[in-house]
Amino acid sequence: MVYEAKIDPSLADLFRNSDKEPFPAMTHELPPEKSLKARLLEQEDERISNVLAHEKRFSTEPVVIDDVFMSRLCVDSQPGCSRIPDIDIANVFRDDLESCTLSSSEDEEEEEEPIGQISTFEMLHAPRKPIVWSEQELSDFDMKSRLLDMRMDHWDLARIANVPKRIAKGETVNLRMPRYSAEVVKQRIAKGVTDIFGHFSLVPHTLTKSHKPVAERKQILIERYHDLMNDFDYATRPGSVESKKYANLTKRLNLCNDFLSAPKLPHRLFPRLIIRSIRPPETPKEPVKRKMRESESDDSVIIIPRKIEKEKPRPTTENVVLKKVEMEKKRPRSPELVPKKIVMEKERPSSPDSEAEEREHNLRIEKERHQKELEFRREALRKREQEREEHKKRAQEELRRQMTAALEESTRRQAEMNRQIEDEARKRDELQRIAEEKKRKQLLEDQCRAKQEKEKRDAEELEQMRLNIARLAGTKDVENALKSPSLVEIVPPSDARAFEMIKWNAVKCKIPENWEKRKDKFYRVFEWPSDAAQRDIERDEVVSIPRSKPIVIPQEDTYITRNRIPLKLPPKVKQAVPALVVRNSNNATRTVVAATVNENGIQWPAETINIDEVVREIRGLMAPTRRNFAISLSPKTDEIDYQAINLNRLKSGIVYPFYFSDGLYWPLVFLKSSKNGKPEAQRHVEALTSCKSFSGKYASRYLLTTTKEEDSATKKFEDAYADSDGDWADYSTKPGRFSNRAGFKPHYDTSNDSFEVQKQRAVDSLNSQYEKERNELDAFGRYTDEYRKRKDRAQYQNHIKTHLRELVRDARLDAFSFKEEFKDFEGGFEDYPGTRVEPYENDWYSHGYTLYSHTRDAAYADYMHDVCKPYEDMLPPTEYHEIFNEWCFTPMLASLHYQLKKNAFDVLSPQDVKDMEARHRKYIGLVQKERKFSLEQALDVCKLTDYDKRQWTILHDQLVTHFKDFPSISGLVYDRNTNLLANVNRNLKHLFSTIYRDDSPPDDQF
């Protein structure tokens, strides 16, 4: 019986309508698939090129006469030359002699050949002569073959199994190509011949049919595509066999219930035997045997008499022949119905008394049968009632148990709720107590401060009284004190506005006495690089920071996670402000920096910062979610589980959108030229290569090998890295690029080592990889220095482009972008690697950037900050960051459409797949070139849904690769002289203020 799989109607509709779904628009056409004719033409061109190469090779060399290959021209041109076996010229392209035609006859008809020089190409089209071997050569060959067989048998060597087939195939090869004149070619064109010049004459010989039987070829094909067939065989999928068993059990249960509800037993409880026999006449012993059988007990024997019929003529044979035995289907055995021994009564002479006895006996049997049937029904009814009572009793016990469990659960919940209320009350009392304690301490501090101020004023009054007494007394010391100047002469600056700003008192501060101890304690708490020289340099840099700039103190040990967040962005170079030159009586001068005035007219002292901004920034950096987020995403401690991270928690720890992604590409705006005349791409690569800790391949290894199974994960990474090379049109169509990734499926620890040992092994491996990448970058730096010294700018530019291509190739792993191309300026635009050409508007690319880097990469971070700072002004106001982040967080959701065609059923349900198809259709219609882009529709399409969160790992990988290769506004030529930034900023503010209007004040993000 062949089992027919039952397919879900929703899946069947999905596969039925899959061919009708429109494909996304492609800017570059895929290379067309080559037809059979095109492939054969390529084979023919390759063969002709080999012939020409061979002709060129042997045209100038002298001809060497040997017994393997010999030109016919040499044989005919030398009179008296002995007959040497000829060989087909086609064999010069083969290494074996399997295509040779062996013949022992020497009476071969020789064709007349033209005398003169014949080119190799003409000889190729000329008719060939078969090879003729003499009897001596054949005997020698046979003897050597036998000797070879003996040696192979001695050393147990295997022979070539298909030598006869190869020889038979080689004999059918015909390398002669017909040569047609112009008239013949015209006639063939008029007839519609496909092969006009006869280039396909070798097709029947090159494409031969396999000699294997059909069954063997089918078996090979099935084994080759076994995995693919299992994916689409719904009968062998998990759950199908269990479903079939469950259906059979359900069917049997229904039949049993129907039988118990209305049993219908047949009239006969025993098998019916219809026996027709042909017996000989009774012998003298037969009556005695019959009496013995009749004398047996009725409990063990039931005599079934034959029907009395007309006596038929009996043959005289002595053997009894059974003609036909029919038996009905046996009923299920039961203890009430046990068939007794059945003995067939032999035929007796019919008489009226025997007929009456037989009818009475039949009635008695029929009555007993009816009585047993009634007893059986009563017993079945009694059992049914008993089972019903037991089932009712079990249901009542189950209901009672559930009610008891529900009561216990409600009691437990009530107790838990009461406990929470008590905890909240206790916490509230604790907070109130802390507030009162704080208020009391503040009151004591105010009292102490007031007391100190009062004592200070009293001391000043006493000092003033002492001076007055001394002055009135007219002492000499007081006169000298009065003669000394008491005021400071102020020299006004050239700017008249400076006099209005002198309202600040200069307070001299000194370093605390325990500064050295505090500094040493700070360096001991945090883990610094093992390089002692580098550590000393960094310490000196920290100490030598000007007092006008804040000291960067990390809030936690972030060196292990390679995430170092600066407390403050590098300040801009401030313009020179007018200074006040103060002179005293001793001709000592000191410079006092004047205050500045901001846009609102409020005066602030120079070289100062807003305290509220610093406090808000410190609170954001010290928030619990931000502080713990780097630990949860550390790629060195354990495997990253993105599905376990809450979306709100992820957003709170991410400025936009991947704050802790190692090896991140900043969304750089490439300028046409800079102040020093270098292209921005060159400056970017120079700054990137000077960054000692950056590497595309090193960062990609974090994303692809986040598992404890080092061997398999490394192999998968190397395979993915090798597959990323080549034509993008071929690479983008590969199925299942995310379902079998190393970091996106649960991996179980198969090692018996402890976690510390495995962690140390992973750290050592990563350190070795880092050292290797650093050595490569150091070598690159040496090469660039040599190019600079030689001033070979062309070679230096080529080297820069090569390095940039490698970096882009590292970031192209599982990325959705086109093949990189390097071009010059065309119409004012410069094409860079990874540039997209979809018809988005400029507003679509508007998103922020993030700064995080290692301590030694501060130069590269400063460079990226200077380039991206003007573009950051295009962002919307702070109160709309949450909406703007969600909008920028989801532009690649709709690009997961290829998962629908490949392997989406491993992650999503059929309903989710339908929803994704609908969203994909909206997305394709949104980015069509003939339609204008609408930001409102884009916001509606790119909203996060529940099924997006269920495929969080795939989504995170898409977004990582998306923002690696997706420049911010690559199609926009950035020009500082235009008013483009102001216009875009104004439009964005108006857009977000109209769509997301909210009169309530924004919530505090921290």
Swiss-Prot record:
<feature type="coiled-coil region">
    <location>
        <begin position="358"/>
        <end position="473"/>
    </location>
</feature>
<dbReference type="GO" id="GO:0045892">
    <property type="term" value="P:negative regulation of DNA-templated transcription"/>
</dbReference>
<keyword id="KW-0175">Coiled coil</keyword>
<dbReference type="InterPro" id="IPR055309">
    <property type="entry name" value="Znf318-like"/>
</dbReference>
<dbReference type="GO" id="GO:0045893">
    <property type="term" value="P:positive regulation of DNA-templated transcription"/>
</dbReference>
<feature type="region of interest" description="Disordered">
    <location>
        <begin position="326"/>
        <end position="371"/>
    </location>
</feature>
<feature type="compositionally biased region" description="Basic and acidic residues">
    <location>
        <begin position="338"/>
        <end position="350"/>
    </location>
</feature>
<dbReference type="GO" id="GO:0005654">
    <property type="term" value="C:nucleoplasm"/>
</dbReference>
<feature type="compositionally biased region" description="Basic and acidic residues">
    <location>
        <begin position="358"/>
        <end position="371"/>
    </location>
</feature>
<protein>
    <recommendedName>
        <fullName>Uncharacterized protein D1044.6</fullName>
    </recommendedName>
</protein>
<feature type="coiled-coil region">
    <location>
        <begin position="756"/>
        <end position="782"/>
    </location>
</feature>
